[in-house]
Swiss-Prot record:
The complex is composed of two ATP-binding proteins (PotA), two transmembrane proteins (PotB and PotC) and a solute-binding protein (PotD). GO terms for molecular function: ABC-type putrescine transporter activity; ATP binding; ATP hydrolysis activity. Keywords: ATP-binding, Cell inner membrane, Cell membrane, Membrane, Nucleotide-binding, Translocase, Transport. It is a peripheral membrane protein. PANTHER family: SPERMIDINE/PUTRESCINE IMPORT ATP-BINDING PROTEIN POTA (PTHR42781), SPERMIDINE_PUTRESCINE IMPORT ATP-BINDING PROTEIN POTA (PTHR42781:SF4). This is Spermidine/putrescine import ATP-binding protein PotA.
Length: 368
């Protein structure tokens, strides 16, 4: 995405709830027209950010701006921001059509405009046929989709979504991810999405904000977050990761080092600066590893030796658990090819493990 003006900025924002620090001196810039996801475990502060942006909470310190204007004390109704929360908050006495059009009626929009926009919103969430039903006649997933339609129909500058797909089944959740992303591109407005689901965040987002304990750990594109984690917390949170302890043996310059892993010297690459003797962690995703049996031709170069502990068929991939000589376990993922007999491994079989040069991520030892 090209660089754009910021529509929302949080500068030095802190929020406490009694003795708990929900947000600790947060700085965050949200770009106009982007799909930004706040990703993290329960209690990390991601929903608190949504509530501060929407005006349902006030910061204890710091500044929040919308289009350059301070919004610290502005009530929710004065902000061009709509929110979809986990609880649906639908009016039980109104039909689906009336629920979706409620905000437009409060704005005294023309009836034909209301009818058109409500119809378009319901079509987006595949509920046109349910327009005259009451919320109690809908499933939980359908009620959540009504809430999304009600928020989108007002064409806000910013739409905030707090885990809106939590009530949906797997298939519908996948479908709604595509629909919401498509809708966001159509409308061109900023979406701020909250989830604890890494796959969901990566599928929908232009940028992802990884949070932990009231702080931001990393901001970047899904690819940056996955392939270039800033620290061990991010690396562990966004997927399976293998962590190998290593010691720098030599610095050859231009980011090329020799590192000793399990008594074997490997070439590694990093933009960070290390000195011989430094302890580091070498991070490798399961799909980065290459596993070879002793009867296979393998590329020349250093390798680790271990035994197959488990082989798990997952359809598109086969996950291998390899136990090294020191007892450390590695997970490798190989794409399944039914014509490739070499992908069939036996428990206890001796194998060698290596990886493509430069695919590793290197972090200082002890970096959280």
């Amino acid at each position: 995405m090209a660089e754009k003006d910021n529509i929302i900025e949080l500068r030095g924002v802190t929020k406490n709830f009694e003795d708990t620090c929900a947000l600790d001196n947060i700085d965050l810039e949200i770009r106009n027209g982007e799909f930004l996801t706040l990703l993290g475990p329960s209690g990390c502060g991601k929903t608190t950010i949504l509530r501060l942006i929407s005006g349902f909470e006030k910061p204890d310190a710091g500044v929040i701006t919308l289009k350059g204007q301070r919004m610290d004390d502005a009530p929710p109704e004065a902000r061009q921001v709509n929110t979809v929360f986990q609880n649906y908050a639908l009016f039980p006495h109104m039909s689906v059509r009336e629920n979706v059009g409620f905000g437009l009626r409060m704005q005294r929009r023309p009836k034909d405009e209301i009818a058109r926009r409500v119809h378009d919103a319901l079509r987006m969430v595949h509920l046109e046929a349910h327009a005259d039903r009451r919320p109690r006649q809908l499933s939980g997933g359908q009620q959540q989709r009504v809430a999304i339609a009600r928020a989108v129909v007002n064409n806000p500058l910013v739409l905030l979504l707090d885990e809106p797909f939590s009530a949906l089944d797997y298939k519908l959740r996948k479908q709604m991810q595509l629909e919401i992303k498509h809708l966001q591109r159509q409308l061109g407005i900023t979406f701020v999405f909250v989830t604890h689901d890494q796959e969901e965040a990566f599928a929908m987002s232009d940028r992802v904000v990884v949070m932990n304990d009231g702080k931001i750990e990393q901001i970047g594109s899904p690819q940056e977050i996955y392939e270039e984690p800033a620290n061990l917390y991010v690396a562990r949170f966004v997927g399976e990761i293998n962590i190998l302890n290593a010691v720098i043996a030599a610095n050859h310059g231009d980011g090329l080092y020799d590192a000793v892993i399990e008594g074997v010297t490997f070439p590694i690459r990093s933009q960070r600066t290390f000195a011989p003797g430094d302890k580091v962690n070498v991070l490798l995703r399961p799909e980065d590893l290459r596993v070879y049996t002793l009867t296979e031709d393998r590329p020349a170069g250093p390798h680790l030796t271990g035994r197959i502990e488990e082989s798990v068929y997952k359809g598109a991939t086969v996950d291998l658990i390899v136990t090294l000589s020191d007892g450390r376990r590695l997970m490798a993922a190989e794409f399944f090819n039914e014509d490739d007999v070499d992908i069939n491994y036996n428990p206890g079989e001796t194998v060698t493990v290596s990886w493509v040069d430069g695919w590793e991520v290197v972090l200082p030892d002890g970096e959280a």
